[in-house]
Curated annotation (Swiss-Prot):
Organism: Raoultella planticola
UniProt-annotated binding residues for ATP: 30-33, 51, 87-91, 415, 479-481, 495
PROSITE patterns hit by this protein: CHAPERONINS_CPN60
Disulfide bonds: none
Pfam families in UniProt: Cpn60_TCP1
EC number(s) recorded for this UniProt protein: 5.6.1.7
Protein's GO biological process: protein refolding
Domain of life: Bacteria
Subunit composition and interactions: Forms a cylinder of 14 subunits composed of two heptameric rings stacked back-to-back. Interacts with the co-chaperonin GroES.
Lineage of the organism: Bacteria, Pseudomonadati, Pseudomonadota, Gammaproteobacteria, Enterobacterales
CDD domains given in the database record: GroEL
Protein name according to UniProt: Chaperonin GroEL
Location relative to the cell: Cytoplasm
Alphabetical UniProt keywords: ATP-binding, Chaperone, Cytoplasm, Isomerase, Nucleotide-binding
């Protein structure tokens, strides 16, 4: 086992604080509308330019192992805030740095670290409750656009684009961000349910100019099995041909004789048919087939529940107003399923989302809800160069997370004002002893740090602005973009409550642990291997 290097008490804490400061100083230059960029060197390709706090934090590794431990713990604050709310990473880092710096001063002055931590925790718990009372719901398109604009570093076009996307697909809809091909940002909205499976044979194409299959008012056959024998299909095909409507087959697979016969029938114009594979794999495929059945008012023909394909009738088939299939995707528009059945299915999936343990499962379930209840919007980010594209895409993703958080828990005044108002409301809070009171003061002082940093990045004097804002009340604050005072909500400077809350909670959590650190252990650096000299040969 490698030898260890151990540091105790103040020696350990000083090293740790140095690491915290290196990381936090690099991150906090990006805060606010006049925050600066950070350039990150990459081992290959062009450097990345970013104003995203967590992207900067993730790049930082320090040579000194004790300092690096401090930096990595603050990196955890940024990552956790990013995972919880998708934004607020820089605010969380600034808060953590302030709590750690002030807290360690108090420890050096002889305060009890555990009582300091209890005081900090008490102040943060009270602050979170106050934030909830300050929060106002964010429901209209204008407020959503303002939140998106602030989070995308004051880029109004991004805010408007996200508001438009949310307007079109609803609060439950899925919005994804992709690289665009032009210079302008574009919004692409997919109506109905779309899944990533294209036609099984190009001979099904009936719109050669677009290379797509379009079926008007088709019947939809859903089968949880491979279809290779055409005899199983004959009763359904005959019934559909009599009804004079097209047929879409969604099955695990359609192959061999069955596929060949369907192609021949389509080409001769006997019956208009298209076949696609069912989306997903394993249990997820079964669930998605059931979603499509609910949406189209059909039944999944599954041998697991004793149903046979030969015995299926038109009553078992789903229907939709229109289906469009290209080589990669199938879109079902306006299924005829009952609204109550669709809502029941959505409620059931939401329940599964609450019980899901992994982020991947949760994301996939959320997509299924969107396909049933809302729709899917794709924001295509346009830029002149690849470097700009990466930077802009990261900002759009941040803004998207922020608007989702705003819809979820509401918004508070931005620009660090909400935390200042919260701090003034809980200023009279008292702990059980004097050391806890110092902990409370440390937390209250830290709540001013985001506003101070925003002002500092503007080139103004933080203390003057902070005192002016404190002398006002309600949403009165400082608009750093225009350098004027006023009502932050009226000026459209909003922060999602969830982002502010998460930043404060995670910063206090990690900072509290660091203040109570008494010993640090790391591996000793390995020395160079001893030189063994040249091996002696056999004399000849």
């Amino acid at each position: 086992m490698a030898a260890k290097d151990v540091k105790f008490g103040n020696d350990a804490r000083v090293k740790m604080l140095r690491g915290v400061n290196v990381l936090a100083d690099a991150v906090k230059v990006t805060l606010g509308p006049k925050g600066r960029n950070v350039v990150l060197d990459k081992s290959f390709g062009a450097p990345t330019i970013t104003k995203d706090g967590v992207s900067v934090a993730r790049e930082i590794e320090l040579e000194d192992k004790f300092e690096n431990m401090g930096a990595q713990m603050v990196k955890e604050v940024a990552s956790k805030a990013n995972d919880a709310a998708g934004d607020g990473t820089t605010t969380a880092t600034v808060l953590a740095q302030s709590i750690i710096t002030e807290g360690l001063k108090a420890v050096a002055a002889g305060m009890n670290p555990m009582d300091l931590k209890r005081g900090i925790d008490k102040a943060v718990a009270a602050a979170v409750e106050e934030l909830k009372t300050l929060s106002v719901p964010c429901s209209d398109s204008k407020a959503i656009a303002q939140v998106g604009t602030i989070s995308a570093n004051s880029d109004e076009t991004v805010g408007k684009l996200i508001a438009e996307a949310m307007d079109k697909v609803g609060k439950e809809g899925v919005i994804t961000v992709e690289d665009g091909t032009g210079l302008q940002d574009e919004l692409d909205v997919v109506e109905g349910m779309q899944f990533d499976r294209g036609y099984l044979s190009p001979y099904f194409i009936n719109k050669p100019e677009t290379g797509a299959v379009e079926l008007e008012s088709p019947f939809i056959l859903l089968a949880d099995k491979k279809i290779s024998n055409i005899r199983e299909m004959l009763p359904v095909l005959e019934a559909v041909a009599k009804a004079g409507k097209p047929l879409l087959i969604i099955a695990e697979d359609v192959e061999g004789e069955a596929l060949a016969t369907l192609v021949v029938n389509t080409m001769r114009g006997i019956v208009k048919v298209a076949a696609v594979k069912a989306p997903g794999f394993g249990d997820r495929r079964k669930a998605m087939l059931q979603d499509i059945a609910t949406l189209t008012g059909g039944t999944v023909i599954s041998e697991e529940i004793g149903m046979e394909l030969e015995k299926s009738t038109l009553e078992d088939l789903g229907q939709a107003k229109r289906v469009v299939i290209n080589k990669d995707t199938t879109t079902i528009i306006d299924g005829v399923g009952e609204e109550s059945a669709i809502q029941g299915r959505v409620t059931q999936i939401r329940q599964q989302i609450e019980e899901a343990t992994s982020d991947y499962d949760r994301e996939k379930l959320q997509e299924r809800v969107a396909k049933l209840a809302g729709g899917v919007a794709v924001i295509k980010v346009g830029a002149a160069t690849e470097v700009e594209m990466k930077e802009k895409k990261a900002r759009v993703e941040d803004a998207l997370h922020a608007t989702r958080a705003a819809v979820e828990e509401g918004v508070v005044a931005g620009g660090g004002v909400a935390l200042i108002r919260v701090a003034s409301k809980i200023a009279e809070l008292k702990g059980q002893n004097e050391d806890q009171n110092v902990g409370i003061k440390v937390a209250l002082r830290a709540m001013e740090s985001p506003l101070r940093q925003i002002v500092l990045n503007c080139g103004e004097e933080p203390s003057v602005v902070a005192n002016t804002v404190k002398s006002g009340d309600g949403n009165y604050g400082y608009n750093a973009a225009t350098e004027e005072y006023g009502n932050m909500i009226d000026m459209g400077i909003l922060d999602p409550t969830k982002v502010t809350r998460s930043a404060l909670q995670y910063a206090a959590s990690v900072a509290g642990l660091m203040i109570t650190t008494e010993c640090m252990v790391t591996d000793l650096p390995k020395g160079d291997a001893p030189d063994l000299g040249a091996a002696g040969g056999m004399g000849g």
